[in-house]
Amino acid sequence: MLVSSNEEQLTAHTPTSSSSIEPKILAACSYSLSVGPCSLAVSPKGVNSKSPSLKNETAFVVDSVSTLSAESSALLYNTQSSLLTGLSMNGYLGEYQEDIIHHLITREKNFLLNVHLSNQQPELRWSMRPALVNFIVEIHNGFDLSIDTLPLSISLMDSYVSRRVVYCKHIQLVACVCLWIASKFHETEDRVPLLQELKLACKNIYAEDLFIRMERHILDTLDWDISIPTPASYIPVLDPIFFLVLDASMFVPNLFKFPASKIACSVMNIVNEHVGSFLLTHPSMESYRKDDNFLWPEDLDTVTSYMENMSKRYANEECTDLLFSSLGRISSILAKKYPEQCAMAAWCNMTEKDTERTL
């Protein structure tokens, strides 16, 4: 049963004059949320949009090309090196591999979302969620926060919404505070967004004390247990192509029923299958194939054993199909965040022109 979040204590503040603070997010932000009773519409700046819409979700299509630039070819080839480096740096290839995975699997069982409870929200609708995720992604990108902060902020928001009644006029506040909590968890102190910056990102519609009170309310609701395993926890790699697919998974509510390990496994399978096939067959990669260590550097067996181990133990065909279908329509915010990787995905047939997102 959803519990009321005590609306009387969370009253929207009358907009104040513009703050002197000019965070990076304002320059980067091209979309704004219209927050009101039962409305959560995303509109490009300067454009009026009065009804909830997903028009900003544009199909990302790149015309087929026969050749790639040298820079793009190098970008593709470096994918394999960054995976090895990321796995090695985080201890996933050493003696602690089984311990790390076992701990994450044990923890993730405690954080599976109850979609039925989320469906009981009196005002929020699933059709509003892509706009809200876009809003969080853009703020995250504007502040240049770490990779792990974004999925944790989304997980915190989803967990809170599945336990408390949240009204439309407060959802932007909840989103920003979840990002704030996640940044405090993952970022160094100097990189955590200032309260005044988050207030300005919300166009000053909430008083500063509301951020503090909402933070405490979210933490109390989650019993202060915010170390939530996310798919990013299983993908300790450095290459953005993995995180393009990972970020795209956050837009698919039907993936809620799968634990983070299965989503992570689906991300790795999709990228490996399509990027790997492209590396092996495309003419532009011929010079790289002459390298004795192509597809992976020297530790090929160690890396592939980790990937195969994850696939055999945690792969789920339905999860992979749902995730792959979502790549047919990449959010315009993600396309702006990962321009080269979106092009790479199109070249590698990871995006389909006629694929519709599953909601």
From Swiss-Prot:
Function in exit from the mitotic cycle. Contributes to negative regulation of the timing of sexual development in fission yeast, and functions at the transition between cycling and non-cycling cells. Interacts with protein kinase A. Keywords: Cell cycle, Cell division, Cyclin. This is Cyclin puc1. SUPFAM superfamilies: Cyclin-like (SSF47954). The gene is puc1. Pfam families: Cyclin_N. The keyword Cell division applies. Coiled coil: none annotated. Belongs to the cyclin family. GO terms for molecular function: cyclin-dependent protein serine/threonine kinase regulator activity.
